[in-house]
Swiss-Prot record:
Modified residues (N6-(pyridoxal phosphate)lysine): K230
Oligomer status and interactors: Homodimer.
Gene name as annotated: glyA
Entries under InterPro entries matching the protein: PyrdxlP-dep_Trfase, PyrdxlP-dep_Trfase_major, PyrdxlP-dep_Trfase_small, Ser_HO-MeTrfase, Ser_HO-MeTrfase-like, Ser_HO-MeTrfase_PLP_BS, SHMT-like_dom
The protein's name: Serine hydroxymethyltransferase
Record keyword Cytoplasm present: yes
Enzyme Commission code: 2.1.2.1
Binding-site residues for (6S)-5,6,7,8-tetrahydrofolate, renumbered to this chain: L121, G125, H126, L127, S355, P356, F357
Role of this protein: Catalyzes the reversible interconversion of serine and glycine with tetrahydrofolate (THF) serving as the one-carbon carrier. This reaction serves as the major source of one-carbon groups required for the biosynthesis of purines, thymidylate, methionine, and other important biomolecules. Also exhibits THF-independent aldolase activity toward beta-hydroxyamino acids, producing glycine and aldehydes, via a retro-aldol mechanism.
Biological pathway: One-carbon metabolism; tetrahydrofolate interconversion; Amino-acid biosynthesis; glycine biosynthesis; glycine from L-serine: step 1/1
Homology family: Belongs to the SHMT family.
């Protein structure tokens, strides 16, 4: 019987080897991809539970199948914890991803072809904020706003003037590669001025918002979307919040039956665990440590004139660095750092001149190293290791030194092998 095959290592050695290799990679590499984090064993246990067996189309108390009394408890726990965590009146925890959450929010607020003002991808926005290759850009008429050419920060007066000119039905705030705090109150004022809805995608900063170390968009946005991983440190999934009951009903209809069928109740259970973890007072210390570590790491680059820190600093978990003075492009930098077991990604910088497949910059985030227990000292050390590798990218002896120093750090701060 299939139930006898409970051990992946024995039943599927080929798959187990790949999983084990990834476990070793995470254990011994320094993870700086800003959209990644390290979940707790409790989150993984919930996601790997028998809840994966249960189909539950609909919502708690109103399902299309029987036998849902247990998953109703699970999903209700996730909903109530999300509401408490973010101070929202309504929460939908069924969205499979941040992209699904954004799609549902758009469906709830606007019609196909409507004009939307969103952050341009090159300035730090996300694919779902209107990229022409994404459903958002194909379905709606997106107009992109950028950052100031001098400060590389959002210019709210310029965004207001742009909103007046294009008269959007919806304004989208939020980013995937913007290192500064966003003034959601100003965005709401702009939206109100032109009679538009305001949607905030807080996927990257959700954990910081939950901990109260970053301003919350919930009091200002008509709808807030998020992922549940990244700084929130939960499973991969989506979340939608609102304080408007009428919009909550539209959101629920957009998620199911509009975009999805049965919810992933095992993932929702893992979300519930992550929300409980984030409600613990210790999570605020964790979130503040992310900000402290990111600032410390960014400062090392700011003090080295061979690199240019985009916008001059960071207020959150992420920052961008122009690396073209020391290496041809961000892609080469990413590949080189992979070789010394430091993982990050190439990233376009504002007013990029290179192709998106090469880029001038790299994006660095500190959520994952903070989850390992690393602090300001280690963050500064990692920055110096990155600089050492990039500046000496053709010196194998020096690159080997960096590999050894990386291994010393990861051994000192084990992930799951404790």
């Amino acid at each position: 019987m299939i139930f006898d095959k409970g051990n992946v290592e024995d039943f599927d050695k080929e798959l187990w080897d790949a999983i084990h290799a990834e476990e070793e990679r995470q254990e011994h590499h320094i993870e700086l991809i800003a959209s990644e984090n390290m979940v707790s064993k409790a989150v993984m246990a919930a996601q790997g539970s028998v809840l994966t067996n249960k189909y539950a189309e609909g919502y708690p108390g109103n399902r299309y199948y029987g036998g849902t009394e247990c998953v109703d408890i699970v999903e209700t726990l996730a909903i109530e914890r999300a509401k408490k965590l973010f101070g929202a009146a309504f929460a939908n925890v069924q969205a499979h991803s941040g992209s699904q959450a954004n799609a549902a929010a758009y469906m709830a607020l606007i019609e196909a072809g409507d004009t939307v003002l969103g952050m341009d991808l090159a300035a730090g926005g996300h694919l779902t904020h209107g990229s022409p290759v994404n459903f958002s850009g194909k379905t709606y008429h997106f107009v992109g706003y950028s950052v100031d050419t001098d400060t590389e920060m959002l210019n709210y007066e310029a965004i207001l003037e742009q909103a007046k000119a294009v008269q959007p039905k919806l304004i989208v705030a939020g980013a995937s590669a913007y290192s500064r705090s966003i003034d959601f109150e100003k965005f709401r004022a702009i939206a109100d001025h032109v009679g538009a809805y305001l949607m905030v995608d807080m996927a990257h900063i959700a954990g910081l918002v939950a901990a109260g170390v970053h301003p919350s968009p919930v009091p200002y946005a008509h709808i807030v979307t998020s992922t549940t991983h990244k700084t929130l440190r939960g499973p991969r999934g989506g979340l939608i919040l609102t304080n408007d009951e009428a919009l909550a009903k539209k959101i629920n209809s957009a998620v199911f039956p509009g975009l999805q069928g049965g919810p992933l109740e095992h993932v929702i259970a893992a979300k519930a665990v992550a929300f409980k973890e984030a409600l613990d007072p210790a999570f605020k210390d964790y979130a503040q440590a992310i900000i402290d570590n990111t600032a410390a790491m960014a400062a090392v680059f700011a003090q080295d004139d061979r690199f240019r820190l985009i916008s001059g600093g960071t207020d959150n978990h992420v920052f961008l660095v122009d690396v073209t003075k020391v290496i041809a492009n961000g892609k080469l930098a990413q590949n080189l750092l992979d070789e010394v077991n430091i993982t990050l990604n190439k990233n376009a910088i504002p007013f990029e001149t290179l192709s998106p497949f090469k880029t001038s910059g790299i994006r660095i985030g500190c959520a994952a190293i903070t989850s390992r227990g690393m602090g300001v000292k280690e963050s500064q050390t990692i920055a110096r290791l990155i600089i050492k590798a990039l500046v000496n990218h053709d010196q194998e002896t020096i690159l080997e030194e960096v590999r050894q120093e990386v291994r010393q750090l990861t051994d000192a701060f084990p992930l799951y092998k404790k």
